[in-house]
Amino acid sequence: MDKSKRPFIKSKRSFRRRLPPIQSGDRIDYRNMSLISRFISEQGKILSRRVNRLTLKQQRLITSAIKQARILSLLPFLNNEKQFERTESTTRTANFRTKNK
């Protein structure tokens, strides 16, 4: 077929492969907080394998390391920053109301 007769074929874009999130020299360990913290969301949840772009074996090792760090209280189970902000704002409004009376 002639190229002019193929109207729906798109030109290929250049593909740049992303670097793997875990290098070959990185050790997946519960004490390696700089590595573990990359795979935890802002709320303290373990991110999924699809989001992390990890292999199955790496995801299992990361998950077990995070859980072990939580048990040894190196990591919090939840990040409740929003909850603390709410309690501070409610106490401020309560104090403001009592001062006006």
From Swiss-Prot:
One of its GO terms (cellular component) is chloroplast. The keyword Ribosomal protein applies. The lineage of its organism: Eukaryota, Viridiplantae, Streptophyta, Embryophyta, Tracheophyta. Two forms, which differ in pI, are produced, S18 alpha and S18 beta. One of its GO terms (molecular function) is small ribosomal subunit rRNA binding. It is found in: Plastid, Chloroplast. GO terms for biological process: translation. Belongs to the bacterial ribosomal protein bS18 family. Component of the chloroplast small ribosomal subunit (SSU). Mature 70S chloroplast ribosomes of higher plants consist of a small (30S) and a large (50S) subunit. The 30S small subunit contains 1 molecule of ribosomal RNA (16S rRNA) and 24 different proteins. The 50S large subunit contains 3 rRNA molecules (23S, 5S and 4.5S rRNA) and 33 different proteins. Its main location: plastid. This is Small ribosomal subunit protein bS18c. Component of the chloroplast ribosome (chloro-ribosome), a dedicated translation machinery responsible for the synthesis of chloroplast genome-encoded proteins, including proteins of the transcription and translation machinery and components of the photosynthetic apparatus. The record marks 1 as: Not N-formylated. Keywords: Chloroplast, Plastid, Ribonucleoprotein, Ribosomal protein, RNA-binding, rRNA-binding.
